[in-house]
Amino acid sequence: MISNIFIFIICYLFISLSVIGYGLIFFSFNKNLKISLNFGYAGLTGLLMLCIYSYFSSFFYEHGSTHNLILIFIGFAYFVFFNLKKIDYHFKVISLFLLIYFVGILIYKSHDDFPYYHFQYTYYLTQMPSVIGIGNFNLGFRTPSSIFYLNSLFYLPIIKFYMFQMAAFLIFLYSNVILISKLIQDNINKKYNFLTFYYLLSFIFINIFFSRVSEHGTDRSAQILILILIGEILSFVNFKVKIEKHLSKLFLLIALIISLKAFYVLYIIFFSIILYKLVNSYK
């Protein structure tokens, strides 16, 4: 029992830090791509990178345990390399949240859709390449989501499929890191405005109503990201910000939200607000 929990903790840290590592790898390509020092945004960026990779790679080969182990190790190694010579404020924040939120991944009962098609879809991606027409076997297979493809990358040796809720948990974790980092930064700078209260209320709301990760399907993860997206849009519209980096944050959040469930493409309306702001800024 103790050995199983120890293995679970190791995999939990291994995956969580590896995803951040992939976000940092993306940031390292060009300084203009570094949208934030916040490890929460690095984590979300890493999720998007892995999501894109998993979609394309699934057509050519299965996401087996050996493949996934190598993939996750690369991200983890970069994260360790990145933080080898410095332990800054952002590292302390992510370490604290990893410690506090560990209990969130200890799931006793999953939500109703998980045994219906979430598990089957994810597990099938680990056993064979993606096949066109699989939706004829189960209606659930006709509604793909990035969360299934992400979870298929967390199928590792020994732990096997017991990390198939990890993608939803990571969105929950990184979103909380983003919110609390913004609150801490406002407190350090002694600059309080309506967004400070918005982020505080969002943090409280997420941790009360979305605290049960076992109930997270594709909807709730997207709803958490929508709360952050609204905050970033309000910041973009009402305050002077670096347009390029802020736009990158908005595109990142919108891309993740739409990838989780197709009907969230309706949130494309937010682009009209962004374009309106851009037009006015260049007048």
What are the functions of these language-model segments?
Residues 55-63, 108-111, 208-218:
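Membrane-interface helix caps and helix-loop-helix hairpins in membrane proteins
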Residues 1-87:
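Membrane-embedded, hydrophobic transmembrane alpha-helices
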Residues 102-195, 213-215:
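Active-site lumenal/periplasmic loops and adjacent helix-entry segments of GT-C-fold
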Residues 188-190, 226-246:
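Membrane-interface transmembrane helices that cradle and orient dolichyl/undecaprenyl
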Residues 75-87, 267-283:
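Perimembrane helix-loop-helix junctions
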Residues 11, 78, 90-113, 204-207:
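Transmembrane signal-anchor helices characteristic of membrane glycosylation enzymes that use polyprenol
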Residues 66-67, 167, 208-235:
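Multi-pass, polyprenyl lipid-linked donor-dependent membrane glycosyltransferases
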